[in-house]
Amino acid sequence: MGRAISKSGPVRALGAMSGTSLDGVDVAVLETDGRDILGFGETGYRAYSDAEREVLRAALGQWTGDAVAAAARVVEAAHIEVMTDHADVDLIGFHGQTVAHAPRLQGTLQVGDGGVLAEALGRPVVWDFRSDDVSMGGEGAPLAPFFHHACARYIGATEPLCFLNLGGVGNVTYVDPRKARPEDEGALLAFDTGPANAPINDFLQSRLGLAMDEGGRIASGGAVENGALELFLAEPYFARMPPKSLDRNDFPEMIGLVTELSDADATATLTAMCAAAVAQGMEHCPKAPSKVLVTGGGRHNPVLMEMLRVSLDCPVEPVETVGLDGDMLEAQAFAYLAVRVARGLPTSAPSTTGVRACVGGGTVTVPEGWTARKT
């Protein structure tokens, strides 16, 4: 019914990511041995409908209950729908949808059952990537840094650089590609910089019924309210040393800081908050990066990108400038991490999540009738 996963050699894996922006499900095929990127495959996307997005929003911040169960059903159905056309793979990496994240309480919840996907798609599924990290004292996020290290080596980078993901929450990975393995000392530093697209999207949804500030058009017509920006940057999170991570809803007062402003001024100020959080976070890098490669939806916002270029003392470019796909990098990351889990390789380290020791987190669910894995 399918190939077993051997101890070495290439594996064709399908990764899926449903991020904190709640826009939809990204899926991407990657060929890897769990260490190096051997090739990129096809990609797919399935947007959430407005009704589905409201179901997901209702579950945010919840750990149990009917809202969480309803969100899980939405996530599973959407993933199965988009994955069906890309399931000719050896292995699937399924992140699920984060609805609650409280690492200081040793809790993180990504809804969606990998077992449901395994049976529906007839492929082994690696899922629940974050729980082991959190149980060992880690933040459980970000998890893409090990893949970022592989990307840096894939593009032939020779000097330290940063990958900046601007989804609902922003996170940055400092990579030294001269280190052979992502778990090597000094290879990586990673953390969440602060809120990114989520508060902008939430504000525009509540004020104007818009899903996002497409092309930065609304922010471009506004002025930044510096008083609100200063209050935002006084939040204790920004004084914490990395590694550190955020839940999508950890800054509920952000929108309150801009509610008295015009639509354009409020959007410009929220955008500036994202850029300022990144700039402040970048001060933690061991040395100035040679460049910052931006991934995630935020790179499509020219106002935000220009704010970053002004704030950071190095080139700021979308990842497409080095041949990578900024819309699919997170999905590709979970394909890569799935293979690492299947082969017993670590997926996070003290320098990326604050976990006590390198850990390979994830549950592997094999569908009935699948050839036994050989690991």
UniProtKB/Swiss-Prot annotation:
Top EC class of this enzyme: transferase
Pathway: Amino-sugar metabolism; 1,6-anhydro-N-acetylmuramate degradation; Cell wall biogenesis; peptidoglycan recycling
Catalytic activity: 1,6-anhydro-N-acetyl-beta-muramate + ATP + H2O = N-acetyl-D-muramate 6-phosphate + ADP + H(+)
Superkingdom: Bacteria
GO biological process annotation, one example: 1,6-anhydro-N-acetyl-beta-muramic acid catabolic process
This protein's UniProt keywords: ATP-binding, Carbohydrate metabolism, Kinase, Nucleotide-binding, Transferase
Family label: Belongs to the anhydro-N-acetylmuramic acid kinase family.
Functional summary from the UniProt entry: Catalyzes the specific phosphorylation of 1,6-anhydro-N-acetylmuramic acid (anhMurNAc) with the simultaneous cleavage of the 1,6-anhydro ring, generating MurNAc-6-P. Is required for the utilization of anhMurNAc either imported from the medium or derived from its own cell wall murein, and thus plays a role in cell wall recycling.
Protein name (database record): Anhydro-N-acetylmuramic acid kinase
Gene (name only): anmK
